[in-house]
Amino acid sequence: MAVTKLVLVRHGESQWNKENRFTGWYDVDLSEKGVSEAKAAGKLLKEEGYSFDFAYTSVLKRAIHTLWNVLDELDQAWLPVEKSWKLNERHYGALQGLNKAETAEKYGDEQVKQWRRGFAVTPPELTKDDERYPGHDPRYAKLSEKELPLTESLALTIDRVIPYWNETILPRMKSGERVIIAAHGNSLRALVKYLDNMSEEGILELNIPTGVPLVYEFDENFKPLKRYYLGNADEIAAKAAAVANQGKAK
């Protein structure tokens, strides 16, 4: 049976991951640790014999720079790359920039867990005169007002990620090309939920660690067979648990 592989990588630790802040569409860069995580992901993929024909990422530099570092370690810096806002992190609305633990102290752990992980729960909206509104950012100049979020739930994130998967990424894989996607915790959770037909309750508990390659294997009909992380299982579990704990009061 022919097996097709897809590699997903959540960006390495960003400066705001380090500071435990809600990031969303804010364009913050990788921390030093994040750069190291991205390089380590690339080295691991090279050791495991992976190479690619095409790459996808978001329009946010923490994902773009993660992809750069991964491809550099693979000696595939020349690889064609498509950047799309549809792979951006979920928009966290008025929470963007706030410290997660301080927000949990103010509103309670459960409310913040719902804002972070609830399937259809949207954080408080931005207003259009807020400097954080994406309509003020030139990279989104060609988007309609309807496409520009004031806030997003995971359900709304799925509404943009999955059509992009079905219309753009999957056809390329079906043509025989080997694909890597460098994106974000929630845009990747959106894709995992769809591919695994995961319940709303199941996705609530899924935490994707930074800078760890996540491999999907598909059968000849492009039905997922399995998914697994590359690397040390104990270290990966600890990183995923740390992601879950970010939204708790100190």
Swiss-Prot record:
Residue numbers marked as site, Transition state stabilizer = 184
- The catalytic activity of this protein is classed by the Enzyme Commission as 5.4.2.11
Q: Which pathway, per its entry?
A: Carbohydrate degradation; glycolysis; pyruvate from D-glyceraldehyde 3-phosphate: step 3/5
- Give one GO biological process term: glycolytic process
Q: Which domain of life is it from?
A: Bacteria
Where are the active-site residues found? 11 (tele-phosphohistidine intermediate), 89 (proton donor/acceptor)
EC supergroup of this enzyme? isomerase
GO terms for MF: phosphoglycerate mutase activity
Coiled coil feature spans: none
Q: Which is one Pfam family of this protein? A: His_Phos_1
**Keywords carried by this UniProt record:** Gluconeogenesis, Glycolysis, Isomerase
Reaction(s) catalysed (UniProt annotation): (2R)-2-phosphoglycerate = (2R)-3-phosphoglycerate
Listed binding positions for substrate are 10-17, 23-24, 62, 89-92, 100, 116-117, 185-186
What family name appears in the similarity comment? Belongs to the phosphoglycerate mutase family. BPG-dependent PGAM subfamily.
Q: What does this protein do?
A: Catalyzes the interconversion of 2-phosphoglycerate and 3-phosphoglycerate.
Q: How does it assemble?
A: Homodimer.
Record-given protein name? 2,3-bisphosphoglycerate-dependent phosphoglycerate mutase
Species:
Shigella dysenteriae serotype 1 (strain Sd197)
- The gene designation is gpmA
